[in-house]
Amino acid sequence: MTSIRTLLAPLALLASLATSAAASDWKPLAPAHLSLKEPKIDPSAAAEALLWEVKVTDDIDGNGVPITIYEHYLRAKIFTDRGREAFATIDIPFDRSISILDLDARTIRPNGTIVDVKRADIYERTVVKTGDVRVKVKSFAAPALEPGAIIEYKWSEQHHDSISTNLRLAFSRDIPVHEVRYLLKPLDVPGFQMVAFPFHGNFPPPVKQADGFTLLALSNVAAQASEEYSPPALEYRPWVFIGYDRTSRSYTGLEFERSFAKDVYEDYARRSRPNDAIRNLASEAVAGLSSTAAKVAALAAAARTRLKRTETDTAPVVARKAKTPKNAGEALSLGSGTGDDVLTLFLALASASRLEAYPAATISRNVLLPRSVRPHAAFFPERLAAVRNGDQWIIVEPANEYSASGEVPWYFELQRALIANVGQPVGFEIPETPASYSLKKRVGTFQLLDDGTLEGEARIEYLGHWGQTLREQDDEQSPADREKALRDLMTERWPGAELSDIRIENMSDLSKPYVNSYKVRIPGFAQRAGQRLILQPAVFQKGVAQTFAAAQRTTQLHFPFAFSEHDDVTITLPEGYSMQEAAGPKPINAGAGLYTPSISASGSTIKYSRKMSLATPGVYATTLYGPLRTFYESMHKADAHTVIVTRTTAP
């Protein structure tokens, strides 16, 4: 199966030679924009973007690998102090597949004077998002901002190992935008045609430019909502998909699926024929196992552990230059390959074990929901394995670096997988895991001192999707960076806290939970009131902001996965102190959400337990926001419950 990417790889070098460097000059500023006093699109807007332009080109990096470059240019007008505060620190997020380069910024004051951002003032940091997940950003502080000022900045995003064949062009930001402009050069490859799918917007026809680029533009774009636990941004913001496909491809749903599944099946069938070495490995892996599920887990582990990955962010440079295997047998012989080679080896092992296994194609729920999938290969970019188990299917991702037995990450659960079998392709919804699978377990053993200081040890275990998610975000960081990120997170919640003996355990031992542990000293954790101390037993919830604090909701609700939490806290009181008897917080049963706290005291020891679970992954209407907010608000109040610790004997 020859893809357009394969055909275009040699052409990317030519494109790089023909592409000129981005102009270093700033774009001309219309006097009307400098004198603009009121927002144009949203009367309540604190700031609006006057222009957001993105130029998309292809290039080749120093290792000969194709890259796609997005040259961004953003100019925004500040109208109020709230807008000034919103732009005080500007963050540009990126991940392991993206490099941020050539970042420049400046402020134009209302009187026309210009204040540049110094390169030395641009830095990289990590910010914490929902669920303790951390994101890397390039940051800078915008200088001399005030109402009436304009902030403009430009940067390049290099997307590694990429050719601009399947583009997702976003047309909205977190503030209204007067004009959005995308400039791209359509690729000319015989036998392929460009296809476009617009979403959530009324887009005018593309306009060809004199320099060979094509302009896609949209004016007066409303701000996109930025709310916690929202669906993927592509589900509600205006965007356009630009892709390419064979000119002979049919675009009716069923005909597309048959043709696409046939290509996928034939590709993997050719590369996953077992040889003697594969048969021997399969026999060893499933020896003594009887159930299909156990065999699948064992074969997935065998495929993952026998091949050293060559394309991951943690792979050494020499591994990335290793020979590319042509099939499963060659991959096993080399002992190395890509994630796709791991999948191919698994399919060969399954065949050797007389299991009925097929490749399956899907898309991440972190990107797009099934309702927005269109009949194009780019909407089925991910490859999994489907193994028949009676009248059901077991779906695994053998190449999952963060699961010992090939369990699928959360973002494939509830997605529709297209199983490419011999005849008619099968559409199958990947089942969700229960809340008990993804457990966050926190254990704390603390001593309360007479002055209100709390000190002791904490251990947090992350299982299931928690463990996979945090391993994935942390594996590219050094041990020192992991420690710093944990220290920063906890000191933000507990100001003045002193952490020591920080340990990050089981990064590579996937058979065990991912663990963070540390010793901590928190001055002033309990507040003194005369001879009494006011103490919050829910130590791990202190300083945590309420989830769903906003009174209103714009976007639908989207929960990545069902999860549970279990806290066990032991606090030893100062000598001569005891806890006054009082009613503790009550359990909460909200159907899919359960919360069970308990507080008890025995002599000088307080025991606190907290169990919480939420069993509602997927997308839910905004009408459910009220009950959900009530649940989280009640839980937050219960977490903040305090007890009175009184001196019972003289010091």
Where do the PLM segments sit?
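Positively charged n-region of N-terminal signal peptides that target proteins for export
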Residues: M1-T6
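Bacterial N-terminal signal peptides
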Residues: L8-A18
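A sensor for short, sequence-defined functional sites
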Residues: A22-P651
